[in-house]
Amino acid sequence: MQGNAVFVSVVLVGCIAHAAKAQDVLELPNLTLPQPNAYAPATNPNASQNAFSPTVTLNAALTEDSEPVNGGLIWRVFGTSPAADGKLPLIATAQGGSTALQLTPGSYFVHTTFGRASASTRIDVGSEPLTQTVVLNAGGLRLDAMLPDGSNVRREQLIFDIYEALVDETSGERTLILPNVPAGQIVRLPEGTYHVVSRYGAINAEIRADLRVQAGKTTDAAIEHRAAQVTLNLVREEGGFPLPDTAWSVLDASTGNIINENIGAFPSMVLAAGEYTAVARHRDRLFRREFVVSAGRDVTVRIQTDEHEVDSENAR
């Protein structure tokens, strides 16, 4: 059972630079590059060989008219002629914000990454100091979710997957960019539209939305989930203590398909709004009860052994 309504509240705010994680690095698609095992601040193996190497200052900005990014950047400088293995030689690396390198005169490829955004440019170093600014044309996306009444969801059960917006013509699927993004984390992305899948809990509360990221801005998007938390109890009488060692199955009432199975006295789960059937097995006895999940209204479903017992043929 899946909610069909999609409500997305989007707010654009000024983009603030935060440190990017190492796993956010993307490779240049059209170049064969080596993969360094570690990054050292402003290292250049050629600098010590030439005391007259000019200083090259590298800056990165989200847009052409924005201030330089002050953190979270990864810089790699490559030579322009492939080595014997077909890869471009790595000349220097650096992390952080703007960086200053000493490079011998010549041509270089500069590759910059900031989260999932990246850019590359070619520079020509002469005998004089050089300052180069790379424009990333990137922004940020910060995801969250809420219930229909505006209250917060349980963030520890909320996760997002970010996909490319366009469907691949060959596979018929979208390309996954970043899985399992937690709520509240800013993801750095190139400007563009992205397809976001929000999953609340691990069963069937899933909402999709297309969101636009603008360069130089952080897009704050809150997706509305029509779901609630459900706790199951099997009791001998009203007000009784839940029976342990109970095996549970939860069925979609409209299809009869099992959507969750669990064992315990009071299993808890998040379900999309809709109609369901709970089946409990305890010591070879079966019990069954229908229940309804309303968006944003957590509920405890109690099955009494003296009212809801069924034979095995009527359990589903």
Label the predicted regions.
Residues 95-107, 114-116, 180-203, 266-277, ...:
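Short Pro-Gly-centered beta-turn/loop motif in secreted/extracellular proteins
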Residues 80-97, 167-183, 252-265:
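Short, acidic Ser/Thr/Gly-rich low-complexity loop/linker segments typical of extracellular
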Residues 8-15:
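Bacterial N-terminal signal peptides
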Residues 18-22:
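Sec/Tat signal peptide C-region and signal peptidase I cleavage site
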Residues 54-64, 141-149, 229-238:
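A short, amphipathic beta-strand motif
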Residues 64-84, 148-172, 237-257:
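Short, ordered, surface-exposed loop/turn motifs in non-cytosolic proteins
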Residues 23-45, 95, 114-137, 201-224, ...:
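Structured interaction patches on ligand/partner-binding surfaces of diverse proteins
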Residues 1-8:
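Bacterial N-terminal signal peptides that target proteins for export
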